[in-house]
Amino acid sequence: MKKIRNFCIIAHIDHGKSTLADRLLGATQTVTAREEKAQLLDNMDLERERGITIKSHAIQMEYKYKGEEYILNLIDTPGHVDFSYEVSRSIAACEGALLIVDAAQSIQAQTISNLYLALENDLEIIPVLNKVDLPSANPEEVSDDIIDLLGCKLEDIIHASGKTGFGVENILAAIIEKIPPPKGDPEEPLQALIFDSVYNPFRGIEVIFRVVNGEIKKGQKIKFMATDNEYFADEIGTLKLNQVPKNVVSAGDVGYLISGIKEAREVKVGDTITDAKVPTTNMITGFEDVKPMVFAGIYPVDTEDYEDLRSSMEKLQLNDASLVFTPESSAALGFGFRCGFLGMLHMEIIQERLEREFDMTVITTVPNVSYLAYTKKEPEKALIVNNPSDLPEPSKLDRVEEPFIKATIITKADFVGNVMSLCIEKRGLITNQTYLTTERVELNFDMPLAEIVFDFYDRLKTVSKGYASFDYSPIGMRTSKLVKLDVLLNAQTVDALSALIHEDNAYNIGKKMTEKLRELIPRQQFDIPIQAAIGAKIIARETIKALRKDVTAKCYGGDISRKRKLLEKQKKGKKRMRQVGNVEIPQEAFMAVLKLND
């Protein structure tokens, strides 16, 4: 146990976590030169393409230091704000963390938020200054920033470069010297924390865990404490680049377990594994469920694929503990699910993974957040509104509360004005402004979460020329003037396009929505009115003109009554068509409504 070190890597997006992890694997000869490729641990195609880490990955390395063999368990974590739960999960399984800061970009908002997560869990922090070989690197200034943030000494900061491999030996030495070995007693009853699970179509669910106390043996009967289900440990082992089966995994180590579990619901991340015969009395605490921030409907394009979609979602949920979904139905789209996501990036990723890994083509509706509505009848009782169609009628409504967040934005001093006006346009309230250095400013805003859901992140990057970084944490519900905006096509409400928005923006959004839909819905044989309404009041209207046949073409001689007869006949036909005709909405129309401000 004294020779084990568990650590994770935390950093802002693109500060070089995955590349540095590759170098560590190379230096410890965990991977041969032949297996080496960039972003070795990002094994989803999607992660490679976007160059981001989505899942945390665990891998074991062996390293000789001063003549002794050490076992290092590395857990690579994502840097994006949407995936901070992945980070918190990995942090729970470690004793130390490498805090990586890009020498060119300095400290960003997420560096700080992930650092606080690590400090709350009492991890030993090793600061690493990455990318020092870049011509634009500014190591002296950035070192000062790190010292201000951590209160460490200048000589504690390790200079490194993931690209060239410079400084990797120093990092490994620091991990062994500074990070404490895991605490725990191999003699006590088994107690292990599940921090990840993966679905394997042939072998069922692979559970990835870290043993806190005791040891787990092959063939032992074990129990999951949250569900009280018992299983046999058919195969256990440690994780190198591939799985290495072992007969016993003891306290302090990270390993995997296969016991032929097929049901996704039986494995809960954050659960405790214990021995079925001699169970431990207490569960491992300090692991809370993630709360989804953004809700959207996901529907199969073909209603018959509903069951396939359900099983695909369950398999995704295994690998992604933060995805929540409940069945719902919509008049326009049939049966589907209302899903909760951590943010817009998460929603896009889930949609892409459904398409890639499970061949499901899905329609997503307008994303929204979760509101609380109070009626005049019972002003004390809160109704949870995840779907705009659940909102009570305006006449019965007393008030609506929406979730607010505290946003921290770090930007260059030149862009403060732009960032402020963007936040104020999004109904933000500035609470604090501090200059970290003469160049960098930290702004704090209280903002409604709903305003961030759409395109806030992209627009923030645009107004700050890519320099601003952004992080947020929820601060509770506040009362707001919200209205439900309905879209009517051919006088019928399309429930999938409804949205809850602030009263002041209603007219603008309604107008934009109708204009956008007019461009995207194909013309029919009859006029289609597109209306935006609040309750019974229509606030904007556009009409898609009918395609018409020239019925008078065959009349030569120009007798007006003959022409009129044919035109009247056509008019009657169009009227009848309009009564029975229904309008198909293409998927592009749903997606375009989300991106109204472009």
UniProtKB/Swiss-Prot annotation:
Question: Which residues take part in binding GTP?
Answer: D14, H15, G16, K17, S18, T19, N130, K131, V132, D133
Q: How does it sit in the membrane?
A: Peripheral membrane protein
Q: How would you classify this enzyme at the top EC level?
A: hydrolase
The record's subcellular locations are: Cell inner membrane
| Keyword Zinc-finger found | no
Coiled coil segments of this chain: none
Q: Which GO terms describe its cellular component?
A: plasma membrane
- State the UniProt keywords alphabetically: Cell inner membrane, Cell membrane, GTP-binding, Hydrolase, Membrane, Nucleotide-binding, Protein biosynthesis
Q: Per the UniProt record, which EC number(s) apply here?
A: 3.6.5.n1
Domain tr-type G intervals: 2-183
NCBIfam families on file: lepA (TIGR01393), small_GTP (TIGR00231)
Protein name as it appears in the record = Elongation factor 4
The source organism is: Flavobacterium johnsoniae (strain ATCC 17061 / DSM 2064 / JCM 8514 / BCRC 14874 / CCUG 350202 / NBRC 14942 / NCIMB 11054 / UW101)
Q: What is the lineage of its organism?
A: Bacteria, Pseudomonadati, Bacteroidota, Flavobacteriia, Flavobacteriales
Q: Which gene encodes it?
A: lepA
